[in-house]
């Protein structure tokens, strides 16, 4: 039974997502349905948490909007995610960046930048 679940989940898992970690600054395009209309909404922030695995994987993204911290928990396997673009790769020593919640202003989104080498094929 367990193998059957793994096979079904592997078939359903999204393959078009970039490799992301806590500390990375990302910009997401989310599909929002309002009544009969459908539009894309941009959401940019820092990943402060990553939990689950496979089809159950979720990330918590935090941004500062008009001086107020806003967090969204987003399932990565959601069909409402149009695209994810990594703006900045963050270098952290922790898996959960909950200490960013106490910070205000620019410091609330400041994480050291990680150097990423370009793939050999490009």
From Swiss-Prot:
A GO molecular-function annotation: structural constituent of ribosome
Keyword Ligase annotated: no
PANTHER family: LARGE RIBOSOMAL SUBUNIT PROTEIN BL19M, RIBOSOMAL PROTEIN L19
Source organism superkingdom: Bacteria
Keyword terms of this UniProt record: Ribonucleoprotein, Ribosomal protein
InterPro entries: Ribosomal_bL19, Ribosomal_bL19_CS, Ribosomal_bL19_sf, Translation_prot_SH3-like_sf
Protein's GO biological process: translation
One CC-aspect GO term: cytosolic large ribosomal subunit
HAMAP family documented for this protein: Ribosomal_bL19
Family: Belongs to the bacterial ribosomal protein bL19 family.
Listed name of the protein: Large ribosomal subunit protein bL19
């Amino acid at each position: 039974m367990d193998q059957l679940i793994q096979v079904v989940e592997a078939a359903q898992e999204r393959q078009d997502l970039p490799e992301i970690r806590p500390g990375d600054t990302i910009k997401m395009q989310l599909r929002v349905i309002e009544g009969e209309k459908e539009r894309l909404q941009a959401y940019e922030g820092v990943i402060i948490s990553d939990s689950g695995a496979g089809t159950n994987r979720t990330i918590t993204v935090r941004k500062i909007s008009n001086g107020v911290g806003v967090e969204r928990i987003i399932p990565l396997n959601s069909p409402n995610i149009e695209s994810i673009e990594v703006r900045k790769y963050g270098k952290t020593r922790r898996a959960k960046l909950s200490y960013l919640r106490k910070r205000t202003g620019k410091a609330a989104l400041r994480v050291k930048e990680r150097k990423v080498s370009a793939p050999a094929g490009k």
